[in-house]
Amino acid sequence: MPALINPVKFMRPLSHRTKIVATIGPASSSVEVIRQMVDAGMNVARLNFSHGSYEDHATMVRLLRSVEQEMDTPITLLQDLQGPKIRIGQLPGGEKQLREGEKVSLVPVEIGDRHPGAVGIDYPHLATEAKVGERILLDDGLLEMKVVSIQDPEVICEVVTGGILKSRKGVNLPGLVLTLPSMTTKDKQDLEFGLSQGIDWVSLSFVRKGEDIHTLKQFLAERGHPDLPVIAKIEKPQAIDNLEEIVAVSNGIMVARGDLGVEVNPEKVPRLQKEIIRRCNVRAIPVITATQMLDSMIQNSRPTRAEASDVANAILDGTDAVMLSGESAVGQYPVKSVQMLRKIAEETEVGLHLVNNPPIENTETHALSEALVVIDGILDLKYIVTFTTSGFTSLLASNQRPSVPVIAFTPSEKVYHSLNLVWGIIPFLINEEFDTFEDLIQQAEVLLRDRKMVEKGDQLLIMAGIPTKIPRGTNFLKIHRIS
């Protein structure tokens, strides 16, 4: 028999099944804070390419990979592309007071210097696409204006809700279908850079239709990365209208509640969140719930009760992961924020019995994933164990939300990192030096015993496709007792 499986890396046993995504920023850019966040439960590091230089991001990637090696546990890198985000230009002095009832002129930033007193906006087609009476929302909807007249290139607005408008704040035009590309020139340049840094997932902002994801995947394929998993961020009304086609072609979905709540009104977001998560669960693709999960912890060391309930409800809805944005990027308590997400997840998952998701295809793999549910309900299992080259077997096992963690043995470093985003999965990166499938099981048992993850008498449910060295769907299910 060949030497025991040599695990290059493995993830430490989970105390929480719901994965934690943390945005990296000034508050979390030191080695010590990253270590503490990983210890606290961070699984995925989000790199927000709306901010920061390439030098900043390259430094963070090196830091994250070094901590990953040092702590011998995966840190998945998620590159979040800015997408066609419309923003206010630079304002004199950096800000402008908007008063209710005041008239404000919006002009393209390129000609702002020819219109003293006007506010520049980096969308040149506003005057030709806007309509009188349309709402224009600024700074995540905190400020609101209404279009009262159009004198190309100026759009004259009346301030409905005033306040301080700062440079580079976001602009939302909820009533308009805009002629924007799905990927901007900046996105393409940023993604080229991300690929050179070895990112594990990429998310595209302001997706409107399935074709947007096809465009991104074609871009990746042309650059030799056809298998890099892609997340579609759902934050536009058009995305809700085209949700089924977007979910069908994406590898994952993010419920981006910030812009979504501005575009469709906040009272609709809870229902939409549940529907988006349900669609993802049916398709067996991972879903992240994001934005303002613990927003008050940017300033405070404890969340509000409503925030704790919000996180718990996302988990009960069936989300794979919950995400921190400003809390971990610029907040005063990045480590405590991760700890709090973990604690809420642990408490919510106690006795959690999610509705099992029906198979979507009549295949051996889907049939076996259904059988997994029955066996899990009868036997006292320690783990579900999957052997996978593509990650699909592990995804299906996780999607059934079993009562025990799913261990995913894979020889692919890409799959190892991508599965680290998925609910309940503990990924192991192994080599392929084995003769028979029985050898593989035996060696996997030794590996788990060495890490004190199993003991004599524990039962494992093993899912795999055999022969293991031939790519194919899952066709094998075995109950294995630790000897």
Curated annotation (Swiss-Prot):
Site (Transition state stabilizer) residue list? K233
Q: What is its EC number?
A: 2.7.1.40
| Alphabetic keyword roster | ATP-binding, Glycolysis, Kinase, Magnesium, Metal-binding, Nucleotide-binding, Potassium, Pyruvate, Transferase
Q: Where does Mg(2+) bind?
A: E235, D259
- Keyword Transferase listed? The answer is yes
Could you tell me the Gene Ontology terms of the biological process aspect for this record?
Answer: glycolytic process
Q: Does the keyword Oxidoreductase apply?
A: no
Q: Where does substrate bind?
A: R46, G258, D259, T291
Describe which pathway this protein belongs to, using the record's wording: Carbohydrate degradation; glycolysis; pyruvate from D-glyceraldehyde 3-phosphate: step 5/5
Q: Which PROSITE patterns match?
A: PYRUVATE_KINASE (PS00110)
Give the residue range of the signal peptide.
Answer: none
Which amino acid positions bind K(+), per UniProt? N48, S50, D80
Q: Which GO terms describe its molecular function?
A: ATP binding; kinase activity; magnesium ion binding; potassium ion binding; pyruvate kinase activity
**NCBIfam families cross-referenced by the UniProt entry:** PRK05826.1, PRK06354.1, pyruv_kin
Q: Which family does it belong to?
A: Belongs to the pyruvate kinase family.
Protein name per Swiss-Prot or TrEMBL:
Pyruvate kinase 1
Per the UniProt record, the source organism is Synechocystis sp. (strain ATCC 27184 / PCC 6803 / Kazusa)
> What's the gene?
pyk1
